């Protein structure tokens, strides 16, 4: 058992209403934490006790500096430390979090998301591969917006393959814009979440931000741009090569996709799966992988994904 004394400032927030925050920390680390005033005792496995002590003392220090936290922020940080014991609270709250356009603060919610952000900041080409809901596209768009606002790039180009779920644009009703918009809607949603509506509209009108089907990139060279290819598992080998060779000087590219959700016709090779094999050892290119543990949607989504994966594995052994 470890006995520590914590300063009073922020202690009530740290523990939460009816000690709900501390109970959550106890469940994550399998420790017991009791407090009488400022005196706190921690009981459990020695390694877990040390981790719990560091969390409490680090948060107390941040509270002492005048920082404030919501219950959600506290619990997200608890979960990340439980996942990665080398996790730094101070770095997380002072470096990892960012506000791309002054509207909304963005923060990684898992170790893989932190790795992904760092990779995008440091490399010219990054592949984010994993199941839906892991923040691959949203974080890439957020970093693109930040790069644009900080004048690191002159424009943002967001692209998706225009063929998904077996539908071809030519067989859908309406004009081209009406046909294309549903496929690109997730990219618009991310932008509107990060930037005020009027500002996004102006940037789109000026083509500072461009959202288009992947086919529209053929024959172009994109310099000083932040380029994102979403749903890349639905590119063919030729399309992926075409996309990667569009990258010009001063540009950065992020490619996201889920290799378990390929909607290409039978016999067509996924460009994302091939790129993973062909490019994994090239300097300047990094692959970051996400699992169901990184899912940041409703907590049931993580459980649903895991259940389907287990079902798929069982079928493969029949």
Predicted regions and their residues:
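A short linear hydrophobic-aromatic micro-motif
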Residues: 29-32, 287-288
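Interdomain "pre-motor" coupling segment immediately N-terminal to P-loop NTPase/helicase cores
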Residues: 34-93
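Conserved helicase motor core of SF1/SF2 NTP-dependent helicases
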Residues: 39, 101-229, 233-318
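Short, flexible turn/loop "capping" segments at secondary-structure junctions
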Residues: 32-35, 282
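Short amphipathic alpha-helix segments
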Residues: 10-29
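Proteins enriched for Cys/Gly/acidic motifs involved in redox and nucleic-acid/cofactor modification
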Residues: 78-109, 121
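Short glycine-/aliphatic-rich beta-strand segments at the starts of folded cytosolic domains
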Residues: 1-12
């Amino acid at each position: 058992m470890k006995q520590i004394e914590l300063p009073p400032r922020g202690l009530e927030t740290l523990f939460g209403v009816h000690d709900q925050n501390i109970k959550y920390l106890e469940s994550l680390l399998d420790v017991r934490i009791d407090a009488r005033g400022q005196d706190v005792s921690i009981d459990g496995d020695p390694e877990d006790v040390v981790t719990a002590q560091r969390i409490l003392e680090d948060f107390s220090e941040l509270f002492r500096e005048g920082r404030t936290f919501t219950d959600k922020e506290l619990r997200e940080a608890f979960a990340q430390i439980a996942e990665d014991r080398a996790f730094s609270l101070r770095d997380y709250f002072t470096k990892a979090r960012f506000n791309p356009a002054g509207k909304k603060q963005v923060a990684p919610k898992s170790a893989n998301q932190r790795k992904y952000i760092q990779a995008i900041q440091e490399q010219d080409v990054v592949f984010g591969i994993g199941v839906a809901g892991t923040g691959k596209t949203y974080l890439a768009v957020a970093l693109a917006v930040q790069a644009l606002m900080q004048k690191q790039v002159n424009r943002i180009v967001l692209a998706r393959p225009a063929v998904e779920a077996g539908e071809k644009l030519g067989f859908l009703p309406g004009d081209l814009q009406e046909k294309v918009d549903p496929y690109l809607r997730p990219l618009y949603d991310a932008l509107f979440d990060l930037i005020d509506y009027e500002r996004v509209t102006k940037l789109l009108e000026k083509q500072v931000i461009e959202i288009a089907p992947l086919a529209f990139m053929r024959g172009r060279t994109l310099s000083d741009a932040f380029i994102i290819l979403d749903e890349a598992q639905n590119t063919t080998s030729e399309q992926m090569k075409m996309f990667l060779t569009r990258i010009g000087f001063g540009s950065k590219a992020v490619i996201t996709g889920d290799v378990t959700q390929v909607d290409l016709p039978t016999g067509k090779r996924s460009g994302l799966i091939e790129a993973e094999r062909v490019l994994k050892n090239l300097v300047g290119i990094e692959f970051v992988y996400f699992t169901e543990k990184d899912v940041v949607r409703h907590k049931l989504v993580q459980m649903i994904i895991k259940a389907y994966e287990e079902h798929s594995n069982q079928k493969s052994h029949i």
